[in-house]
Structure formats: structure tokens, C-alpha cells
Amino acid sequence: MSFKVNWNSLETEPLTNWTKELLTSALNSGKSPNILALNITIKDLNFGKIAPDFEILEIGELDRDRFRGIFKIDYQGDFHLTLHTKVQANPLNIYYHNSLEKEVCNYSQDEFITPNFLLSNEQFAIPLDLKLSDIKINGIGIIVFSKSKGLTLVFRNDPLDSIKVSSTFDTVQVLANFLQKQIENQIRDLFRETLPTLIHQLSLKYLSLDNNINEIKSKLSQQDSVSMTNNELASSLKLFDDEENEFPLIYSSKNLQKNMQLFKSRETFRLSAPKFKNIVQRTRLDKFTKSYPNLLNSLYANNADLQHRFVNNINHGHNNNSNTSSTGIPIELLVSHDDKQHYGKTDNLLKDISSIQANNFYKYSNKDAPNKPKRRRIKVHKKSKVKQDDNTVKASELQNVDSTFMESRSISPQETIDTTSTLIESAPMTRNVSTNIKSPTLETMSTGSSSSASSQVIAHPTPKRAHQPADSTVSTTTINKENHIDYIKARNLYQDFIQMSQSPGYYDKVISNGRGIGLGNSGGNYFGFNGNGNGLERTMSASPIKHLNKDKKSINYIDTSKINEKLNQFRLDGGKNSANTNNSSGGKNFRPGFTRNESNGQQGILFEAFNFPSVAPPPPPYC
């Protein structure tokens, strides 16, 4: 859709004068820069002979009182505008005023001491004529019009294509280029911000007010004899005639008339004030609250037998001159002593109350919703359950014991074990260790009943023997003692046979010499890091025969066949050697119960105090 505008109709003197006044007020609004020595005036304004092309691209909304659409404007005409002003040519004066604004800010010049230079304060104004012509505009804008909110114009793009700026300083090329750039930027800001705001204010001032001012004046004058005096009417009409009013009137005449009638109807001393439709007045608020549906009123309405109580309650409230009536349910309805025939049964009343509350709940909520009204439930003649003690242990909890504890042999409580161990040293020492081992037990506590759970013993696991005795009827105490004794015997035998073995070890070179093992001992370094050669050096085989190297045993290898031979020898010859040694020693450095064998230049110590079996137990396993 396009329009053809009669552009020649704009060349009228009233429109030209109105446009000049509008542009002058817009250009001089706000604070003027310090470079201007005089206000800006419109010297010449000419719309030209070429009309712009105005095209409506889209109409979004169209009604009697509102319009919204998208348009396109294209102008390449002969419009020109000439502005006249005076600029300040004294740079010292401009710098002086700019520095005052920057340093003093909001302080008055009387409170701030400034130097008074004569030359810098002198005015040197030069007249300036600025002509704008050859304007080319091409843009797309949105127009929104409402009868109550006015006209709004917004451009989607930058509509200014080009403009020609000519002034009295065209001979100075630097000033001409500066003015060209500055004016182009200002005109772009004009189309983007200033022009939409200006058009909106003008539409509110001249469209809405001009269309309704005559109608408002006529209707207000007709009500002069009824609701207003002549002075009040004159003052109100003067208010509408005042063009300098800061608050533009944007209400319609019908709304103003209704509001005026409502306001004037309350300016009276009459007791019977006129009612308003669909309005609750403060003077009639008590009647509204009494007639408002609540739980008590609904309960009275559903039960015909309770209506006389409802009437008595209202009369009692009027007699007491109470402004607020209680909407709660009287306790007499639920517990009554004078009229037991009607009010003795509370079940029916409670069901009615529940149904009323449920209907009120589902009235303002979705019936299909899963949420149900929450009710307070009171159970009568219900005893509270006895709380169980937190320390109570249930029998079922005892079944969660680890199976490894159940399979291991238990140690009887308060069992005393005396052990005597001997270190392999030149001066043997005796150590007596007496330990009391008590088996932990779980004491069952009462759970409120007379029967008590059977006690179960949980014992710490002990190392198992290599072979179990055939007789299973041996008592637990005897088995535990034998296991413990056999373990000590096997441990000592293992240490003894390692010492007597042919494999090279640190017993011969370190322990026999009284030297310790470790990096910090002065007697020697086991790893052979010292330079004197006293430490043990780990020898490596240099034989070229590969298969012999493969069959060569490590230094930590233990020959079990030799160990068995030694065991048999000790078993067969132990008594004889012990007797001979006992006679030769004289009882000084020999302890009874030990056997010494000094064959092959090695000393061996064997426990004979314990009657161990004929077959020696194997070494204890490493964990």
C-alpha cells in the first residue's frame, strides 16, 4: 500500500511558523555548550517541491483508536534549513569556562577562588550561518498510534544517507570538515532518539487534548448548578486551558466524568449515601462480612435445627454493639448439655463440617489433582508405644558376625600363659611374659520380655597347627595351650636350624662377632658400602658355565634334607648329649632342659623341656 502526498499543501505560513518554533525549542533545550555565545534560531525553512516516497509495508493492527504498522520512507528532495547563531572565538574564554565546570563542578563560584584574568574573560563572538541541504533519507520505521497513548515512531536502521553542510567557515577547510562530521552525527542522533521523543510528546499534547477539550468543557459547564459553584468551574476550566501544564491530560472524557460524579457524591452529610454497583463501601463492610459465606453460615444453612441458634447469635451481636462477629463454630454445637436429643451426636456435625471444607477446597483447586486436603486427626483412647532403649541388642544382629571369627578356635576367659623364650646370644637371657587373655563376649540385654538370648562368645583368631590331633574330645583349654606351646617350639627350632645350616648368613660374621646389622653400626656395613672391607659383601658367581649357574642355589636357600637329618640326630642322641654336657659343665652356664651339639664347629640349642612329637613341625608360615 502506498500513498501520494500533496506536498504543496505544506507550504503554508502557519505550518512553517509552527515548525520553526518547534525546532527552535528543541535545539535550545538543555544546557548549551560553552562555544556558543548565543541561542540558535531558524533563519530560513523551505520544504521544497519534491515530495518523499512513503510506503506502508505491513499493518499489524488496525482499529478505531489504535494502529500499528511498518513503513518505508525515501526522500531525495530540495529541502533546506538555515540556522543562525554566534560562536565564541576566544579560546582562553572557552578553556576558562570548561575548566570551571570540570574542577568546581556543583560548587558556586563565590565559594571557589578563581583568578580573574581580563583577557580570558572577554567575549569575542563571531556570527555563524549554517545551511543544511541535499538531504537524502532512506529508512524503515515502525509507527504505533493509540488514541490514549499518542504516536510513537522508531527507525529500524540509520535513515540518513548523506547531507550537505555549508557555513560561513567554508574557506577554512579544517573547520568545514569538522562541522560536516559533527552535524552528521547530531542528525543521526536526532533520527534515533530526539525525533521519536518529540513526536510522542506532540501527539499527546495536540491529539488527545485537542479532541477532548471542548467536550469536557461543555459537560463541566452543564453540572455547574448541581455539583459545583461558578468559582470552582472557572478554576477547573482554567486548568484545562493552561497550555503550560506539565502533566498532559491523557484520560478520556467519560472516565473524567465518572470520576467527578463519584467524588462529588461523597461530599455530603446525608446518611443514605447512594450505592455504587459492584463496589463494597467501608460504611457497609459489616453487612458484607455477615453475608459472606463461611463455615458457620454454611453449617446453619445445611441444618434446619440450628437456625434458631444462628438468629440468636445475630441478635446477641447487635445487642452487644459488636462490629466484628465471630465466624467460628461454638463449642455448644459439639458438646451440649441442655438439648441432648439434637446435639448429643457429634458425628453428623463433624461430617457436615468435613464436607463443607472439602467443597471449599476443591472449589479453588483442580479436582483431578492428586493433592488432598490435609486434616488434623486425633485418636482417642490410644496409648503411646513404649520406646525401646537405644542400647538394646536384637538377637538377629548377632548373626552378622564375620565367619572367620566363628571358625577360629576360641580362647577361654582368664587363661594364663607363661612363656619362656631365649635369644640366640653368647649370654642368654630369660624373659617371663605373663599375659591374661580374656575373650570378649556380647552381653545380651533385655528387650522387654522375660526370655533372654543365649550368650555367644566371639574369640580372636589364633594360628592353626599343621596337623590336628586325632582326639577331638580334648578340652578347649588344653588344645589352646598345646597350640601355643607348639607354635613357640616351632619358632625356636626354625631359628636354631637356620643358624646350623650350611648356607652363608649373617649369623657367622655379624652376630658371632658381636656386631649389629644396619647402615648405622660402626662394626661393619652389611651391604658393603664401607671401604675397609669389614662389611659383608655379596659375591656374584663368575663361572662361564651357564647350566651350572642355572642350578646354583641362592644364599637364602634352606636344605630341608639336612634339616631332617639334624632333627633325627637330635631326637636319637639328645638324651646322651644332655647327660654328658650336664656333667662337664658343672652347672654353671648350663640350664636344664637344653641340649648342645658342637659338631662341625657350630653351636646348636634345642628345646627338650617340651615333649614335642617325633616328627618336627615345619617352620611357621610367613604371613
UniProtKB/Swiss-Prot annotation:
Compositional bias segments (type: Basic residues): 372-385
PROSITE patterns: SMP
Family annotation (InterPro entries): Mdm34, SMP_LBD
Top-level taxon: Eukaryota
Annotated keywords: Lipid transport, Lipid-binding, Membrane, Mitochondrion, Mitochondrion outer membrane, Transmembrane, Transmembrane beta strand, Transport
Family named by the database record: Belongs to the MDM34 family.
Name of this protein: Mitochondrial distribution and morphology protein 34
Source organism (scientific name): Candida albicans (strain SC5314 / ATCC MYA-2876)
Gene (name only): MDM34
